[in-house]
Amino acid sequence: MATEINMPMGPGPLGEAGSLKIDTGSNMEVSIPSPVSAAPGELNETPSPSTPANPNSASRRPPRKSTLTQQQKNQKRQRATQDQLTTLEQEFAKNPTPTATVRDRIAEEINMTERSVQIWFQNRRAKIKLMAKKSLETGEDIDSIPESMRTYLAMQAMESGKGFPGAFLGRGMMPYGHGNMLMAGEQGGPSKVVIHHLTCRSLSIGKWTRVGQNTMDLIVFYSPDKCTMTYYINNEQAGYKIEYHFSCIKSICVENADDPTKVGGIVIELNRPPSFFMDQSPTSNGFFQCGDFTEDQQASQCLVHHLGGNPKVLSGQLAKLVSLESFMNRHNTMAYHPDPMAHGGMPVSAPVSPTNRPSSQPNFAQPHVGLFQESQWGISPAHHVMRGPGHKRQRSRSVPIAVDFSMLQTPMPSFYIQHPGEAQPQPHSPNIYAPVPQQPHALSPAGPGLRIDTQAGFGLDMRQYPMSATTAPSPSEYNSPSFFSQAPENTPLPASNFNTPYSSTFLSPMMNATNLNVPQSVSPISFSGGDPAIVDQSPPMSMLGRSASADIYHGGDSSAISDDGHSLNDMYSKHAITLPMHPPHSPAFVEPSQAELDMNQLVQFDTVDPSSLSPESVHQGIGGQ
């Protein structure tokens, strides 16, 4: 089967499409239309099926924009001239991502098509990205990257969540006024500088307003590591920056626009004017500090900045900013700073605690602003510093915390509040870790001369299990300090008639046990005597209640851990025990004249002969039968 292809050597008549005639030998012809060569003068006119025949209607709709490149228009390969390249380089230095309107203006100036200008910018951005990637490995060609392109690369790195080398950012990203301006050209190597973007479309300071037409016209970002907020503004052939430290921020909040005519966004109030910088690339090498470039110097007089944008988007971005530790401690002059040259060019050591404390003691957390700060343990509010980055040290649970008991030897209120304005650090005592050993002794007689023993009495241990080796049931070698005035320690404990356990109301099987007689506590602690000096500014201890249930265990049982299975530690080893105490004048107290009820009166047991329980007596009874 033969196939013949007939191709005409020239195009058909104008308006008639040429064809390829294929003879397949099976009486079937296939006609394929061939492209029509347009006249050279008709390159800019792209035929459209929707073009109306009426010329009046054609004037209403603008003609479709040409997508031809300069080579397609001239039908030959052509390179850009030196003047065209110079103009393109200058425009790229100002803004690497121009809009279609800007590209049309550039194309008219240099006599190129808009499509050719767009392709040149795309190729230039790709070349700069490749150059920046190689510069990370070799450290070369960093100075050849324009400042605007560095900001563009930083924005892309921020949006992707990756770090960006600080060497690309030059002096523009470094905080001024902290000694870093002199170190801008002395960076040993590229370091990661992470910036976060605030999606803002406008900036208003007083009567001066800037509105971003594209991505590079207005960029608002902050650096958590440098603790700076920056507004980058691109105008014509120069870039401008307004920058200030976190410590300059007095207040910051999100404003929702209730009025449709107003724009919502972030409102920032400063406590001092910001710093101003400008960059006239490529004539200058990076940003340099300048005066206030706003209209009538509004930014130096008005300290309220309004960043317009979507409140929903900005609220999430602002929440991330205010949660930063560097932002929360922005007004702390002794805050941790990662740069050793940040404070006057002098090296700063790590924060040192004003008191000598063991390594197992935890760091003192900074109290809430609304609370009074106590300085009775030797910690002054002026010494509260921000913890540096790293692992927070935790106190060992098996080692008791060190407390300066020497301050407690003198009478003092139990609720001692020191106002921040009167904070005075207490002198450190060398005896804080060397208490005087004392021998165990019995409780002193009831009265103001009570001395508290650290050993758990009455066989009741309020501590939770498991316990460490430091809580073994051994006699306490180091007793508590003298909270109250002491009495002779050799005075014996007065005899007491302790009640039987089943006469207590909390163990009674009666349904209405509150009507029973609740015997008064015979504890050696006195609730009717004079209050000791340590609670002279506190509620009187006689108002605290004490029930006879607290005396269920006799004073002779002094073991910290019970050996038998009947103590409350075995019954409620996993729960905290709270025993109520009721004084005679408490509403829960019942008069002694009411009826008494003993457990023996409720349950009667027959008399059992002990000899009848012997196996021998049972065996004899069976044998007798």
From Swiss-Prot:
Q: Where is the composition biased (Low complexity)?
A: 46-59
A GO MF label: RNA polymerase II cis-regulatory region sequence-specific DNA binding
Keyword list, A-Z: DNA-binding, Homeobox, Nucleus, Transcription, Transcription regulation
State where it is primarily located.
Answer: nucleus
Q: What are the boundaries of the signal sequence?
A: none
Q: Which stretches are labeled DNA-binding?
A: 73-132
Task: Describe the task this protein carries out.
Answer: Transcriptional regulator; part of the gene cluster that mediates the biosynthesis of pyriculol and pyriculariol, two heptaketides that induce lesion formation upon application on rice leaves but are dispensable for pathogenicity. With TRF1, negatively regulates the expression of the gene cluster and the subsequent pyriculol and pyriculariol production.
Entries under PANTHER family matching the protein:
HEMATOPOIETICALLY-EXPRESSED HOMEOBOX PROTEIN HHEX (PTHR24324:SF5), HOMEOBOX PROTEIN HHEX (PTHR24324)
Protein's UniProt name: Pyriculol/pyriculariol biosynthesis cluster transcription factor 1
Native species of this protein?
Answer: Pyricularia oryzae (strain 70-15 / ATCC MYA-4617 / FGSC 8958)
Q: What's the name of its gene?
A: TRF2
